[in-house]
Amino acid sequence: MYVSPDDARSDVILAAAATVLGGFAVAFLTRLPLYPQRGLLAMLLGVVWILALTAVVPLLLSRYRGDRAAAFGLDGPRGAWVGGLVLAAPVALVGIVLELFRSGQVTDVLLGRIGTAARLATLFDAAATTTVVAGLRFAALTVGTLALVGFLAVRGREAFRPTDVSLTQLVRTLGMGAAGAALVLGLLRSLGPGRPVPVLVNAVGLAVLVLLADRLVPAGRDVPRAAIVTPVVVVVVAHVFAAGGLFRGDLPLALYTGALAAGTATVIAALALTRDRAWAILPLAVALHWWPTCLSPLALELGAALC
């Protein structure tokens, strides 16, 4: 299905506005006196906001344009997800190590956010209910990552078509650059309220993820630079605003988590653009949100990951 450059640019703007500016609307609503702050309704609304800020607009636009799965790069062979298991491994290891570092609970570390939710269930939120909602949140974050990053990459390729560059070169340059930036920014922040161990684990995990993705991306494939840069810029801006903005928020935190998100978004976007190996991002997205880590491209994970 052909999408004109003008339509693609409008789609990029709408999807970016939904995730960046939509966050302001959600923040305003959650501060209203009648908004539920506790209980099942509050948790379910949290799941709804995740989908509204990430997946709803891309899904509606893909349906309107008529390209559906192709709008996310997922119209290729689905068996490619098996190759993505190797990408999920370093992310899973990062999640397990950080969970052990935070809680010291060895028994339920493999249960990820589900185990954490059950352990932290309060008197007002029964463990079973909390666990179910945690599962819904995990599913929403996974779908949101696949929809938002894949959609921005595909539409960015169609919206801006300057001279094509090597896809592997973009993965190496942007991905490893993001890992290096995250390491430096995180260590600088650890001089204040941050801690150096999670910074090192996250940065090394991202670097390993980029190196593995570099082996998975087909050599000799050229794409417009904007196809990768578009989702990277959007997720970084979203992280800056989620942390409070340039002047009133925690800018060091925003830049650190934004760098990690940029590296992960680079990997997801690159694989989505290959089409034949795009489904490899599915295991990666699952691992990114089964264990809440700062590697998620979604700023909505900042609180859960304790970045």
What are these regions (language model features)?
Residues 1-8:
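Short, Lys/Arg-rich, polar N-terminal cytosolic tail immediately upstream
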Residues 9-17, 165-174, 222-230, 277-280:
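Membrane-interfacial loop-to-transmembrane alpha-helix junctions, especially the N-terminal start
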Residues 14-66, 113-125:
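Alpha-helical transmembrane segments in multi-pass membrane proteins
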Residues 20-29, 92-97, 175-189, 230-245, ...:
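Aromatic-anchored segments of alpha-helical transmembrane domains
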Residues 34-45, 68-226, 245-253, 257, ...:
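Juxtamembrane helix-loop-helix connectors linking adjacent transmembrane helices
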Residues 51, 150, 265-266:
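A structural signal for well-ordered alpha-helical segments within the folded catalytic domains
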Residues 58-59, 150, 154, 269:
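Transmembrane alpha-helix boundary and packing residues in multipass membrane permease domains
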Residues 203-219, 223-307:
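Functionally important transmembrane alpha-helices
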